[in-house]
């Protein structure tokens, strides 16, 4: 497929705008949560579903929707998904009950699962020149990173003047713009030999991913003592094992499991998982640091994190020329090494640290993240024929969703466990209050407010200091993981060419011998 240059760059703009909308929406709910709870009064289980159902639907359907896009057309799927996303955003904004809100958020997740793989696979199909493709994927990665940083800022700004639903209603005009312009500008592309969509694989992939993500999120929130965590984890792992075995037998699988035997593909996936694993856990810790330790407002804390998004955007934009100069393995290793260095800098943060130091640490870590994601995403896409770009995009994004959930579960547990175990309270604190104080820093500040003034001041100061100490331990754990991954990535990606040539299918629909995907 030959696409005129203006339409190529128009496609990139629309894909980036769609991804920007999704990235903002992934983080904006946390800003709206306090007002939402105050006005709607959901029960505790309802609130957890309001927060989590979007991610469950999104993660569970990415693989399926990536394959659907390869079959019916990526443009068609994107326009359908964006229309549904706009409608679901309006339903979410005006939800009258918690049950309505949960259903609307689930629909948002389904729509998001159609959009995410469509954006990246369209870029893969219109940018057939390998060097321009690397540049385009770098721009897409930059915009995605910027969107995650903008979410808290946009949410905080809207909530200062409007009701909680405004953070979702703002999606509607952007979705309309994408649908109207995209219907004219976007070229259509699909796999000319898609084969039959295996209807057994679809539920296996959905159950496997959703159950594992549910188990990880539940473990992060409630610990691993409950039977529900283990039942969900077992169900998810069994489903994923059955899914993987079935893919190996199918002529037209949802996921070509042979790709994981290719070092470039599996190495890039692994780098993505561990990088997002560490970054999301650090983001969670520092959101609490800004708001609960320093006492900043949600808007101020969102603005404080903006340099990180800008750094990641800059890293993504610079990745393509760096690949030309250094090669893929070295750029990924450099990115992971910079992220590790940034985490070491994070590990020195205490209650007296100035914001300027925080900005420096954020920029170092986030530029490294930008390098890593831009190169690994391009490597993943380049490892498969463009006819299967939707499936490859879905694999990458599913791995990131699971890596993020795993990071919050594991490093979040390190943070919470260190806080609980190291907190030393004055003897005069009542036992029931002590239990609430040990539960979380937020609970500590709320409980301390009801204690006598002098005792409240002591408890508040102690809880904040213990949290900061625990945060230091958590980010240093992340630094070690990133440093180890930098060494592993250098080995795994060694020999991957700077410019990965186009992968074509033979007459039977398999990657031609000698291509990257066939190795």
Labelled PLM ranges:
Residues 67-200, 352:
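Helix-loop-helix hairpins in multi-pass membrane proteins, especially solute transporters
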Residues 172-190, 208-218, 235-249, 486-493:
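C-terminal membrane-cytosol helix-exit motif in multi-pass small-molecule transporters
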Residues 8-24, 29-31, 41-44, 200, ...:
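12-transmembrane solute porter fold
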Residues 52-66, 116-120, 306-318:
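Central cavity-lining transmembrane alpha-helices of secondary-active solute carriers
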């Amino acid at each position: 497929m030959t696409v005129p240059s203006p339409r190529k760059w128009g496609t990139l703009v629309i894909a980036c705008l769609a991804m920007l909308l999704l990235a903002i929406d992934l983080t904006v709910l946390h800003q709206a949560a306090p007002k939402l709870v105050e006005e709607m009064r959901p029960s505790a289980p309802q609130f957890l579903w309001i927060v989590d159902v979007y991610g469950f639907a999104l993660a569970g359907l990415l693989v399926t929707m990536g394959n659907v896009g390869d079959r019916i057309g990526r443009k068609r799927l994107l326009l359908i998904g964006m229309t549904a996303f706009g409608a679901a955003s309006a339903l979410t904004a005006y939800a009258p009950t918690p049950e309505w809100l949960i259903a609307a958020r689930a629909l948002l997740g389904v729509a998001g699962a159609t959009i995410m793989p469509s954006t990246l696979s369209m870029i893969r199909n219109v940018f057939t020149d390998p060097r321009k493709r690397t540049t385009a994927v770098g721009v897409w990665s930059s915009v995605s990173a910027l969107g995650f940083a903008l979410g808290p800022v946009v949410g905080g700004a809207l909530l200062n003047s409007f009701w909680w639903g405004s953070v979702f209603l703002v999606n509607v005009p952007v979705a309309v713009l994408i649908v109207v312009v995209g219907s004219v500008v976007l070229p259509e592309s699909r796999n000319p030999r898609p084969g039959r969509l295996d209807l057994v694989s679809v539920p296996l992939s959905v159950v496997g991913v959703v159950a594992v993500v549910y188990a990880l999120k539940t473990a992060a929130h409630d610990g691993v003592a409950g039977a529900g965590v283990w039942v969900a984890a077992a169900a998810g792992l069994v489903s994923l094992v059955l899914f993987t075995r079935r893919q190996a037998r199918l002529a037209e699988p949802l996921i070509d499991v042979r790709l994981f035997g290719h070092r470039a593909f599996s190495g890039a996936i692994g780098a993505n998982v561990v990088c997002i694993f560490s970054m999301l856990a650090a983001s969670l810790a520092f959101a609490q640091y800004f708001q609960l330790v320093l006492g900043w407002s949600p808007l101020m804390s969102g603005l404080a994190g903006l340099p990180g998004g800008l750094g990641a955007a800059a890293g993504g934009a610079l990745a393509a020329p760096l690949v030309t100069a250094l090669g893929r393995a070295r750029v990924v290793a450099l990115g992971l090494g910079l992220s590790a260095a940034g985490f070491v800098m994070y590990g020195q943060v205490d209650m007296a640290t100035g914001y300027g130091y925080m900005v420096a640490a954020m920029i170092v870590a986030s530029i490294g993240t930008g390098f890593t994601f831009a190169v690994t995403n391009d490597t993943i896409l380049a490892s498969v024929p463009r006819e299967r770009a939707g499936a490859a995009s879905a694999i990458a994004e599913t791995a990131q969703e699971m890596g993020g959930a795993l990071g919050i579960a594991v490093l979040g547990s390190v943070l919470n466990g260190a806080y609980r175990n190291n907190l030393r309270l004055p003897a005069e604190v009542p036992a029931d209050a002590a239990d609430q104080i040990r539960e979380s820093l937020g609970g500590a500040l709320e409980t301390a407010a009801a204690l006598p003034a002098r005792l409240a001041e002591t408890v508040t100061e102690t809880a904040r200091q213990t949290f900061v100490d625990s945060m230091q331990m958590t980010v240093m754990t992340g630094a070690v993981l990133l440093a180890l991954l930098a060494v592993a990535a250098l080995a795994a990606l060694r020999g991957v060419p700077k410019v990965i040539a186009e992968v074509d299918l033979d007459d039977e629909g398999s990657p031609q011998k000698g291509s990257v995907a066939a190795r």
